[in-house]
């Protein structure tokens, strides 16, 4: 009864904002003597089939919880592996581990860790439950950006790795498959398609054999725990790898077509604000690094870690929020336009943090500080049209193609972007690479490789079009055509490859690409 009354008021424009909605819920609960206010997900569950597409969209736009989760064009689903030791031991700041029944480097109280624990670390159940949660709060889950978290995945037993990934695909497919290859094949046409698969690991566990294995799983991105570009800081934190490991892992991954995301830390023992700033300048300017994406993690003091003991004894002092905010702002101010800042700070509940950044909205605080101090971040995420203006109607006539060329990891990179000049917003982008020293057999005869193609804005179901937003308007195809032109005319290449997510392969097939090993290929002759 109450759900239908709310629905009628939304459709008649009597409820226009979240505040209107909350007030109306309270009024109706009092009117009907209800003790509990219904969540938005319950209203969404009971939408009548008689609603038109426009009416449904109007309701979804108001009731969708945390709309930012799908403003980049996809729905993110993160799952965690079961607790296991890291091969090198344990870093000084690192919480978690098998003794606490949590994956290494997690407290067990992060939302993803709690979902994993509640589902007994079963990848199928984690996947199904997370997709159902996202659907229940109004998000499209046709296109899934899938992330495997929880320690050093590439160091796990091979059988566990393959079983885990297969179960993730089975969860997206909602059916049991006989093998990993079968699960991947089913996913090409599934309701929830894996358009990207991310694996988290350490730089010293990202060699050729590790890359070959994750490519076989359908991986499109690797996240490396680089942390810093100073060997003395890595040694002091007990990291167990060197800067050279990060350089090698970056080149091998890029030359295989993978997108590369760095996890970078500030405030580590042995570092300082000046050193932290320099560390970020180096990764953006030194061609041996140049990641496509970064996550910025302030060092946190958590009980049970070696760092906690150092902090208690006065041997270590954490950066305060007053120090962190301008530091991160300065970092953001020089991030290149071809880099996306994926995340700022860990998802750890503040009561678990003894010292360090405790505010959960650090990104928003930094943004406000930058605005007040006349600073701007030009990273991809800050300029994605979905974050700048999610309701903007993007007309192809208002969009301009831009290009940035740079050298990275012994290869040539071209970053193509379609940008809305009036909004100063990115509509879509593509990363094209001419590899330096690829080890993959498919790439031995030359050719360029598209490492990323993405159209941003609110995620739309596959096949659906919308007047507003940027998705499904041919932007991806136009970027791909320009990449093909550059490959043929400027690099004299006879073929172009794409490292596609399993669930995006049909898109490339429609554009003339065929399967070639783990890649999609198009002959340009």
Spell out what each predicted region is.
Residues 1-126, 130-176, 337:
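Flexible, acidic/Gly-rich N-terminal and inter-domain linker regions that tether
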Residues 109-126, 146, 150-261, 265-322, ...:
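Conserved non-cysteine loop/helix-boundary elements of the Radical SAM core domain that shape
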Residues 316-431, 435-437:
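C-terminal accessory regions of radical SAM enzymes
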Residues 419-471:
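Conserved acyl-donor/pantetheine-binding loop and adjacent beta-alpha core of acyl/acetyltransferases
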Residues 466-486:
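Conserved acetyl-CoA-binding loop-helix of GNAT-fold acetyltransferases
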Residues 486-500:
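Conserved GNAT acetyl-CoA-binding A-motif
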Residues 500-519:
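Conserved active-site alpha-helix within GNAT-family acetyltransferase domains
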């Amino acid at each position: 009864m109450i759900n239908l009354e709310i629905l009628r008021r939304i459709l008649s424009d009597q409820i226009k904002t979240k505040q209107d909605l909350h007030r109306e819920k309270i009024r109706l609960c009092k009117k009907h003597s209800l003790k509990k206010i219904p969540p938005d997900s319950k209203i969404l569950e009971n939408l009548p089939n008689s609603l038109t597409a426009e009416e449904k969209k109007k309701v979804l736009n108001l009731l969708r919880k945390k709309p930012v989760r799908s403003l980049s064009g996809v729905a993110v689903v993160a799952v965690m592996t079961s607790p296991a030791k890291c091969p090198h031991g344990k870093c000084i700041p690192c919480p978690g581990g098998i003794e606490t029944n949590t994956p290494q480097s997690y407290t067990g109280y992060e939302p993803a860790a709690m979902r994993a624990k509640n589902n007994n670390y079963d990848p199928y159940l984690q996947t199904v439950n997370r997709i159902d949660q996202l659907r229940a709060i109004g998000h499209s889950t046709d296109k899934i950006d899938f992330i495997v978290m929880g320690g050093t995945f590439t160091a796990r037993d091979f059988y566990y790795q393959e079983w885990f990934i297969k179960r993730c695909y089975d969860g997206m497919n909602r059916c049991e498959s006989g093998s990993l290859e079968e699960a991947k094949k089913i996913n090409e046409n599934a309701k929830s398609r894996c358009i990207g698969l991310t694996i988290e690991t350490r730089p010293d566990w990202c060699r050729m054999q590790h890359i070959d294995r994750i490519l076989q799983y359908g991986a499109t991105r690797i996240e490396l725990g680089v942390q810093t570009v100073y060997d003395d800081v890595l040694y002091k934190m007990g990291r167990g790898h060197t800067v050279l490991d990060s350089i090698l892992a970056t080149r091998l991954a890029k030359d295989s077509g993978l997108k590369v995301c760095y996890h970078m830390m500030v405030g580590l023992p042995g570092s300082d604000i000046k050193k932290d700033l320099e560390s970020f300048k180096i990764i953006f300017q030194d061609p041996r690094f140049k990641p496509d994406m970064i996550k910025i993690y302030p060092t946190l003091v958590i009980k049970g870690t070696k760092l906690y003991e150092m902090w208690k004894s006065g041997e270590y002092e954490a950066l305060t929020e007053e120090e962190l905010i301008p530091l991160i702002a300065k970092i953001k101010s020089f991030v290149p336009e071809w880099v996306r800042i994926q995340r700022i700070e860990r998802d750890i509940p503040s009561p678990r943090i003894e010292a360090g950044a405790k505010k959960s909205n650090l990104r928003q605080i930094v943004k406000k500080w930058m605005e007040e101090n006349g600073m701007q971040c030009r990273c991809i995420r800050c300029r994605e049209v979905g974050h700048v203006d999610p309701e903007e109607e993007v007309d192809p006539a208002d969009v301009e193609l831009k290009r940035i060329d740079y050298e990275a990891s012994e290869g040539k990179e071209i970053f193509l972007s379609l940008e809305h000049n009036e909004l100063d917003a990115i509509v879509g982008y593509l990363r094209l690479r001419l590899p330096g020293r690829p080890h993959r057999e498919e790439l031995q005869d030359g050719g360029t490789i598209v490492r990323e193609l993405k159209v941003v804005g609110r995620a739309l179901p596959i096949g659906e079009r919308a007047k507003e937003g940027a998705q499904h308007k041919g932007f991806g195809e136009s970027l791909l055509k320009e990449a093909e032109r550059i490959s043929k005319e400027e690099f004299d290449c006879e073929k172009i490859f794409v490292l596609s997510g399993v669930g995006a392969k049909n898109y490339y097939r429609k554009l003339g690409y065929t399967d070639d090993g783990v890649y999609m290929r198009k002959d340009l002759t």
